[in-house]
Amino acid sequence: MKTLLLLMGLLLSWESGWAISDKELQEMSTEGSKYVNKEIKNALKEVKQIKTQIEQTNEERKLLLSSLEEAKKKKEDALNDTRDSENKLKASQGVCNETMTALWEECKPCLKQTCMKFYARVCRSGSGLVGHQLEEFLNQSSPFYFWINGDRIDSLMENDREQSHVMDVMEDSFTRASSIMDELFQDRFFLRRPQDTQYYSPFSSFPRGSLFFNPKSRFARNVMPFPLLEPFNFHDVFQPFYDMIHQAQQAMDAHLQRTPYHFPTMEFTENNDRTVCKEIRHNSTGCLRMKDQCEKCQEILEVDCSASNPTQTLLRQQLNASLQLAEKFSRLYDQLLQSYQQKMLNTSALLKQLNEQFTWVSQLANLTQSDDQHYLQVFTVNSHNSDPSIPSGLTKVIVKLFNSFPITVTVPQEVSSPNFMENVAEKALQQYRRKSQEE
């Protein structure tokens, strides 16, 4: 009824060309403030929804971490078996050495030529230096190293070190971010609901009741060092939230600032050319991936020394079995590590949403420390009747959200429209949020 009387009064004033009275502007401000109040409630509700999503993502991360730990244990067991078999084989490497050495001398030229062709075609830069480095590497390598797939073992060990490093970095980021988020989400603002469903005033003085914090909580004592009967300073209460969200996001993104980990594949394929080029430049081991393309190199792998030393054949079989198992679990670990990294990216994105959604409300509320519930104040209203420069059918309104900068809004409606002030308030909030994000 009150809204209807307001519209009737505005319509009569409008058609008569009268200026809108202060009382009518005040009533329009009240109507617009109701919309702003609703949007603030929605924003705070979305903040809590994002918080729930972050918690769900963290639970998924914990399950994934258990799978990672299990895969790591199996991978390490297989690596230990591989190293054990390798050491036992090294103790008897003199067997068949003459046969292997002869084949190795024929294998090296083919391997070098094949590798350099690949490098010139795919990797391109620094072929001369790489060629010299490869020559030294092949001359210093033994056919026995080749025979026991030493390159695969070395690659596996290097990958294991990188995996451990990446996991440590990500866990450190998660631990620091989780500590901050635990403090942020514990039974305070995020667990309380508005008690006044008719008019929610999160920016009023404390005598209305704290809607966010349990005053007895440690966090509440930290951010509310003043007596409850003193005026409510929104900035003092919400600034810790803002700071903590920002700190959590920084912690989560820390690992992304470091050198990214390229998840390798164990086979030589066109899809991992970058990894092969890196290995060739680093220590030439990438060239050994091309042994399948050289006949004499393949013959070394097929040398059978069982006649001279039967136990060596068994040891080699054990080595190959444990090596394949270690490679299998290393690939599984890489897959889980990628999923874990994706959880970090998802959490970081949610923290960004939380930051953006929370910031505009806290910035808006920080503009006032009074008990005035008029979040939106209407200062002037003009249409074609009062200002001929305004096109017919449009209404120009100047408002303020609290004591912010003046916001000019133009809506394709007459003042008498039932949802006029709701549309004005919506456009004003949109402008305010855009400007807040730009700052």
From Swiss-Prot:
Q: Name one GO biological process term.
A: immune complex clearance
Membrane topology (UniProt): Peripheral membrane protein
Primary location: secreted
Keyword Ribosomal protein found: no
Record GO terms (molecular function):
misfolded protein binding; ubiquitin protein ligase binding; unfolded protein binding
PROSITE patterns reported for this sequence: CLUSTERIN_1, CLUSTERIN_2
Name positions with the PTM Phosphoserine: 127
Question: Mind telling me how this protein is modified after translation?
Answer: Proteolytically cleaved on its way through the secretory system, probably within the Golgi lumen. Proteolytic cleavage is not necessary for its chaperone activity. All non-secreted forms are not proteolytically cleaved. Chaperone activity of uncleaved forms is dependent on a non-reducing environment. Polyubiquitinated, leading to proteasomal degradation. Under cellular stress, the intracellular level of cleaved form is reduced due to proteasomal degradation.
Q: Which keywords are on file for this protein?
A: Chaperone, Cytoplasm, Cytoplasmic vesicle, Disulfide bond, Endoplasmic reticulum, Glycoprotein, Membrane, Microsome, Mitochondrion, Nucleus, Phosphoprotein, Secreted, Signal, Ubl conjugation
Q: Where does the record say carbohydrate is attached?
A: 80, 97, 139, 283, 320, 346, 366
Report where it is expressed, by tissue: Expressed abundantly in liver, testis, and brain.
Q: Carries keyword Cytoplasm?
A: yes
Record-linked InterPro entries: Clusterin, Clusterin-like, Clusterin_C, Clusterin_CS, Clusterin_N
Query: Which family does the record assign?
Result: Belongs to the clusterin family.
The protein's role, per its UniProt record: Functions as extracellular chaperone that prevents aggregation of non native proteins. Prevents stress-induced aggregation of blood plasma proteins. Inhibits formation of amyloid fibrils by APP, APOC2, B2M, CALCA, CSN3, SNCA and aggregation-prone LYZ variants (in vitro). Does not require ATP. Maintains partially unfolded proteins in a state appropriate for subsequent refolding by other chaperones, such as HSPA8/HSC70. Does not refold proteins by itself.
* UniProt-recorded name of the protein: Clusterin
- Look up and give the organism this protein is from: Bos taurus (Bovine)
Classification from the root reads: Eukaryota, Metazoa, Chordata, Craniata, Vertebrata
